[in-house]
Amino acid sequence: MNRLIVLFLIVTMICATIAVPSREELEDQKEYKRSAALAGTIIEGASLGFQILDKVLGELGKVSRKIAVGVDNESGGSWTALNAYFRSGTTDVILPEFVPNQKALLYSGRKDTGPVATGAVAAFAYYMSNGHTLGVMFSVPFDYNFYSNWWDVKVYSGKRRADQGMYEDMYYGNPYRGDNGWHQKNLGYGLRMKGIMTSAGEAILQIRISR
């Protein structure tokens, strides 16, 4: 009997020393799981915002030139990824293959690894179920003494992959400066665009495509 009492006391002491996660700690763990590996995925379109894109930036680590991109599909149709073309820099993720209506794609880019003078400059393309191509361009330069952040969105007739020509068409066309302000325009084909890009070297680009 005495042995059982001693054993019970020992087990009780051991259990008392085991840390039980608090509610706050459990919430932090859930939040970490939700935010892990966001770039290259699809989320609910209504949930896209700066908070999500900040987490995408955080995934890229301590990189001086990087960008988190979110594009909300409210076009009424579905999109299929074609490709991404990087004029400068690179990415660690693949474009989400399929973006249904009312979903948003998350993507990211960064400068090349090492002490190299590159930014994150690219264009990517999605083939839309209406038979046309959605092109997105962003430019986060290395040297802000000569360049600024720029971005644009354009719809191309038919199917067209992203390449240097698509990038230059938007970059040298009439792009929007990354000025921390909202911009909108008519894309044609019954679609509209509204978006914003921040001005820093760790940039956020949020876009909404709608009817």
UniProtKB/Swiss-Prot annotation:
Residues with site note (Interacts with the lipid membrane): R177
Species of origin: Heteractis magnifica
Propeptide, residue positions: 20-34
Positions of the UniProt region annotated as N-terminal region: 45-64
Annotated site residue numbers, Important in the initial contact with the lipid membrane: Y147
BP-aspect Gene Ontology terms: cytolysis in another organism; monoatomic cation transport; pore complex assembly
Sites where the protein binds phosphocholine: S88, V121, S139, P141, Y167, Y171, Y172
Protein's recorded name: DELTA-stichotoxin-Hmg2a
